[in-house]
From Swiss-Prot:
Keywords: Ribonucleoprotein, Ribosomal protein. Gene3D superfamilies: 3.30.1330.30. GO terms for cellular component: cytosolic large ribosomal subunit. HAMAP family: Ribosomal_eL30 (MF_00481). One of its GO terms (molecular function) is RNA binding. This is Large ribosomal subunit protein eL30. It comes from the Eukaryota. Belongs to the eukaryotic ribosomal protein eL30 family. InterPro entries: Ribosomal_eL30, Ribosomal_eL30-like, Ribosomal_eL30-like_sf, Ribosomal_eL30_CS, Ribosomal_eL8/eL30/eS12/Gad45. Pfam families: Ribosomal_L7Ae (PF01248).
Length: 114
């Protein structure tokens, strides 16, 4: 449990750095749009995202060879981690800015073949 909390805190701090210095889009429609354009570097999905939406995002991410991270908190916690006062189910990072969030994600979450 302690390890899980520590990794969640490190992801949250990296997310906050992306919000300050990087470029990102929030929401399903915008996420799918940047995935189709091939601009997304990393997708983050909350754990209570509906299964159909989750599989649709994972399918487009696989086609675009983009990493997908399943956030361990729900959409309210993901919104709070992003510094927003609303729920965020999906988030696409197009430019990480000063953050090393893309390099720091474990290999199994990136969806890429080893």
């Amino acid at each position: 449990m302690k390890q899980k909390r520590k990794t969640m805190e490190s992801i949250n701090s990296r997310l906050q750095l992306v919000m300050k210095s990087g470029k990102y889009v929030l929401g399903l429609k915008e996420t799918l749009k940047v995935l189709r354009q091939g601009k997304a570097k990393l997708i983050i999905i909350a754990n209570n995202t509906p299964a159909l939406r989750k599989s649709e995002i994972e399918y487009y991410a696989m086609l675009a060879k983009t990493g997908v991270h399943h956030y361990s908190g729900n959409n309210i916690e993901l919104g709070t981690a992003c510094g927003k006062y609303f729920r965020v189910c999906t988030l696409a990072i197009t430019d990480p800015g000063d953050s090393d969030i893309i390099r720091s994600m474990p290999a199994e979450d990136k969806g890429e073949a080893k």
